[in-house]
Structure formats: structure tokens, C-alpha cells
Amino acid sequence: MWRRSIRLLTLIGVSLLSFSANAFDESAPFGLSWGPVDKIPTPSLVTRHGNITLVIYRHDRLPPDQLPRTEEIVLQVCKNEGLQQIIWISKFLPDSEEKMLLENIFEQGDRRYGKAEAGERETLRWNGGQTTVAAISNDQGLHRIFMASNGPTIETCSTDHGHPISDHWMLLLGKP
């Protein structure tokens, strides 16, 4: 069961790493497409911030057999550009699971895009910053992993919004 869960987590990581930021390649993680959103499964919560609609899927709306270690998936949908960011947030994980999952994510990212580069707030990123990963720990020694994949027109959406839309999820990292 534990190995199966790690395999599924690896598939999540691969899914988040497996897109091109090329505007002509409309593929996005989880079988979604960058750009206009016509139909999505019923979310746990929808909230709006200026030109961005956050569509949040919590564990209650995620298939437990396919995403057992997922706490949330957040879609950032821009008014004019459509879907421009997908954020995957793990449940809190013990050391061994976090280490194995991060090793798999780094291996996949490095294989696809080359060596990761350091980003802001102690993140690592690939593909010119289009895919970012970060991890935090709580006071009980458990760890949470965040991965964000950006769409091809995220900069335009961020300009309309007044600041980078990645700032929203990076606040969860709690790092200056």
C-alpha cells in the first residue's frame, strides 16, 4: 500500500512537470488545458480575488484512490486568460515519504528540464520558473510539499492582477 501511494504521488509530480509553457501546447496537469475553462468538476470552494477566480479541490472532492496524499489542488483562473496556474498541495507527510517523493519529483524535473534552479523563498524551479516545488515542515516534524505549474500567459494575468499570482500560494510557505 505504501509503495503504491508513493507511485501515485510520483505520478502527480510527473503530471505537474509534464507540460510545455509554449502557447501552442495547451496541455496542463491533471488532463486540464491552459486557457478558457468551460467545464470543471464540482469544487470544494470557489473564491474571487480581483481578476482571478480560485477553484479549490480539497480532499473531500478528490478521488482518494488516485490522490491519497493530496490535501488540495488549487486552480487559478484568470478572467481574460483562463486557467493559468495549478497548485498541488500534499497532506502532511513523515520524513521518509517526503524524502522519497521529493527525490522522485527532482529526478523527473531534472530529466525533463535539466537541473533545477533556486527560486525565491527557498523554492526550486524548472523550465524557466514555469514549474516550482517547495516544502515546509510543521512543529511536529511533518512535511508538506507544494508544486505549482504555470500556464503560458500567467505574466499577463499577473500584470492585470497587480502582482504575481504566485504570491498567493507562496504566502503558505511562511518564508520571507
Per-region residue spans from a language model:
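N-terminal signal peptide c-region/cleavage motif recognized by signal peptidases
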Residues: 18-20
